[in-house]
Amino acid sequence: MLAGLLMSGSAFGWGREGHETIAKIADNNLKPSARKVIERYLGDHSIVYYAKWMDEYRHTPEYAVTTKWHVARVDENLVYSPYPEAGDAISAINEAVELLKDYENLPDSTVAVNIKYLLHLVGDMHCPAHVYYLGRNQDYKVKFGGGYIKPVKEM
């Protein structure tokens, strides 16, 4: 249930505006039952509030492992190319979805952080600058919010 609700930032990505926009669309489409479950784990804040959370915490020692999770690679045929050494957005999304299938048997803190991961990473995957195109020049420009955001240069 939690994974389904989410599947419906900065110079290198959406920033707050883009993440909050995507989260607001998800929030507007939540089923009441999903909203109730999410509120149990996120408290008084909506999913929009936590949309950029992962960008704000990835530089802390506790969440440093998530630094490379914000992008995904595709090959010359635009087929997803996993990055198992450090992880990536797709593998992190899949792991969070698998964990949350058993959310009722997980510690509340584990459920909350995985909801936040999904909120953020699904938003990242809707930003062209968060996709690394193997074998291609990464110098394309993506205009957002009146300025250009830079694509991922390497992974």
PLM segments and residue spans:
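N-terminal signal peptide c-region/cleavage motif recognized by signal peptidases
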Residues: S8-S10
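N-terminal, motif-rich segments that launch catalysis or mediate targeting to/interaction with membranes
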Residues: F12-L121, P128-M155
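Sec-dependent signal peptide recognition
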Residues: M1-A3
